[in-house]
Amino acid sequence: MIEVKGKFITLAGSLMSLYPEQREKADAVLFRRTGKHWNELDPDGFYDTGIYKSFLDAYCEGSITGEKALITLGRNYFPTIKKLGGIPDNINDELDMIVFSTRSFAEDHKGSGIRPIKVMKARKGDVVLDIPDCGYDCRLGEGVYLGILSIYGIDNGLVVQERCIKKGNPTCEFHISW
């Protein structure tokens, strides 16, 4: 079983304020499994990614954009982490932040089969990442990297998924350019 830190479930729950019925539905799954609500979780405690996925699915269900809402959700991750002081001082630019996000992923997940994100290429303006499957829709990752670029004022960056496990590839690969 793969697990994710509670801070991501809490963030998803907080971003679902526009969709209270869907948040309650996902929160009921969480409460049945843990005895806690989305805003009561230990931010650094680990919880089954199936619970997190129930929040992601409910978020999509509530949004008029459907699964594209995951891009919006992902875009909020690192800007929120930055606002909360969770970015090390030695992160100087978008390239540093993308590389940091690969280490952060490994620290924020645990379980059988989890592996770090592999950096295939990392040059200013051009990054390729090999991302493991955690059962999340890949649009979440697309949003994460667009959100990182936006922190540095880059609004015209591109995140292109070149390979996908769900399409029969052995791994997911994202090409990030700006």
Model-inferred region functions:
Residues F31, L149-S150:
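Residue-level preference for well-ordered alpha-helical positions
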Residues Q22-K25, E94, G157, Q161:
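Functionally constrained cores in energy, signaling, and assembly domains
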